[in-house]
A protein has these predicted regions:
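Positively charged n-region of N-terminal signal peptides that target proteins for export
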Residues: 1-5
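Hydrophobic helical h-region of N-terminal Sec-dependent signal peptides
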Residues: 7-11
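N-terminal signal peptide c-region/cleavage motif recognized by signal peptidases
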Residues: 13-16
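Serine-dependent protease modules
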Residues: 20-237
C-alpha cells in the first residue's frame, strides 16, 4: 500500500511541476506581443501619395445672369491638383501592389514609399470602382517584401486581426482588434457591391488601401471604409 501511495505522490508532484511550467509566472509572460508579426508583415505595407486632377464644382449661381459675369474667368474652369493619401499592400516581389480605387483610380501621378524609405513611381494596371480596388505596378521594383494571401472562406468571426497603414499621414502605424463580422455589404458604407470583412481594429483616413492581416501574417483584406459619426476610428495617441 505504501508503494502505491509513494507512486501517487511522485506522480502528482510531476504533474504539478509540468503544469507550473505551462502557467505564466509573471505579468511579462501573460502579455501578448505582436512584435514578431509586425516585423514580418509591416515592410510589405506601403504609403501611397497620389495627385488627382479635379474640376471645380458647378454652382447654380452661374445660370443666373446677375452672377454670370463673376464666373467668366477661364482660370476657374481649369482642373486643380489635389493630393490623395493612402496605403497599399505589396503582393509580389516584382512590385505588384493592391490599394483602393478611391486612392489612386483617377491619379495622374503616383508615388509609393516603402517602410525602409525606398521610393517608386507607380502606374495603375487594373481598377474596380464598384469594389473600390486597384492594382498597381511599381516601376523598376524587384526583391520586395510581400504578404501571402488568405482565402476569405476560412476567416471566422472572433479571430485576431491587425490593421497596418498610414493614418492621417503620420507614418506607418499598427492597430489591433478582431474580425467582428463577415459578408458585409458595401452598400451600407457607400462603396458599392462586394464582400466586406468588419473589424473593430481602429482604422482612420490614410489607412485606406492598407492591410488587415491575421496572426500568421496573411492578408485578410484591404482596409476600405469606415462607418463613423466622427470621421475616424481614432486610436491615435
Amino acid at each position: 500500500m505504501m508503494k502505491y501511495f509513494v507512486f501517487f505522490v511522485a506522480l502528482w508532484c510531476a504533474v504539478g511541476a509540468a503544469a507550473q511550467q505551462q502557467v505564466p509566472q509573471s505579468a511579462a509572460q501573460v502579455q501578448l506581443s505582436f512584435v514578431p508579426l509586425v516585423r514580418q508583415s509591416a515592410p510589405a505595407v506601403v504609403n501611397i501619395y497620389a495627385k488627382i486632377m479635379s474640376k471645380p464644382q458647378a454652382t447654380p449661381l452661374r445660370s443666373d445672369p446677375f452672377f454670370e459675369r463673376f464666373f467668366r474667368n477661364p482660370g476657374m474652369e481649369k482642373p486643380r491638383a489635389q493630393n490623395s493619401l493612402g496605403s497599399g499592400v505589396i503582393l509580389s516581389a516584382d512590385g505588384i501592389v493592391v490599394s483602393n480605387f478611391h486612392v489612386v483610380g483617377m491619379a495622374t501621378d503616383i508615388r509609393v514609399v516603402l517602410a525602409d524609405r525606398r521610393e517608386y513611381s507607380a502606374r495603375v494596371l487594373l481598377g474596380d470602382a464598384d469594389n473600390d480596388l486597384a492594382i498597381l505596378q511599381l516601376e523598376g521594383a524587384e526583391d520586395l517584401p510581400y504578404l501571402p494571401l488568405r482565402g476569405s472562406d476560412s476567416v471566422e468571426v472572433g479571430e485576431l486581426a491587425l490593421a497596418i497603414g498610414n493614418p492621417f499621414g503620420v507614418g506607418q502605424t499598427v492597430t489591433s482588434g478582431i474580425v467582428s463580422g463577415l459578408a458585409r455589404s458595401g452598400a451600407a458604407a457607400g462603396t458599392g457591391r462586394g464582400y466586406f470583412i468588419q473589424t473593430d481594429a481602429p482604422i482612420n483616413p490614410g489607412n485606406s488601401g492598407g492591410a488587415l492581416i491575421d496572426v500568421e501574417g496573411r492578408l485578410l483584406g484591404i482596409n476600405t471604409s469606415i462607418l463613423t459619426r466622427s470621421g475616424g476610428s481614432n486610436g491615435i495617441g
